[in-house]
Amino acid sequence: MPSALVTGGSSGIGFAIARMRRDEGYEVTLAARTREKVEAAAAELGAHAVTANMGSEEDCVRAVSDHRERYGGLDVLVNSAGLGIAGTVDGLQTKHIDLQLGVNLRGLLLVTREAIPLLRESKGWVFNLASIAGTAPTPGLTVYGATKAAVIALTRSQNLELEAAGVRAVAICPGFVDTAMAEWSGLATDEMITPDDCAEVVRMCLRLSPNARIPLVVIERVGSRDLVG
């Protein structure tokens, strides 16, 4: 049975992707930092829960090793954990810069590094949740956008580094998605992209032939004219 590890899997986009993977017969590990939330989400899906903060190297390593010990391999890695703190570069405290870099980029790198040996064995997939903010200037979300631009660059390089092993990587770049993270936008629910839209991108990619890959998917909000969705 194929398996997937989803960071940030207790809610939002990560949960939607995990639910769709479970519906299609995958064994799933959810990794998230709040024990109560990740255990409740895992119980709802019949998945395995790992309490892990993606800002911690130890937790990143443990999330992958726990999945390996439980399921023996890994077919799909979903790096969905992330956060954004609004502010200009000169207005953000160092701790807020470090937090975004630590979770959005460093944590993603560490989890991926640990998972690559398993993905080589399965000729698996990596899905990195980037953002449309990583594809265009985003005043007020400068650091967040920079971390997501880095994720896009990382994804493109991963494809070239790992193609001989049959491993493929996708950067998913949505605009505002109907999650708690986008509440500050003031947009109505029916104006936003849904978490299931992102999950559908994963499903589509997993149906590709071995000779095809889609390194970057941008999901725009219909009717939007703003830079980040």
What are the language-model segments listed below?
Residues 10-11:
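Conserved glycine-rich cofactor-binding loop
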Residues 52-62, 94:
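The beta1-alpha1 cofactor-binding region of Rossmann-like NAD(H)/NADP(H)-dependent oxidoreductases
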Residues 164, 171-172, 187-227:
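C-terminal helical subdomain
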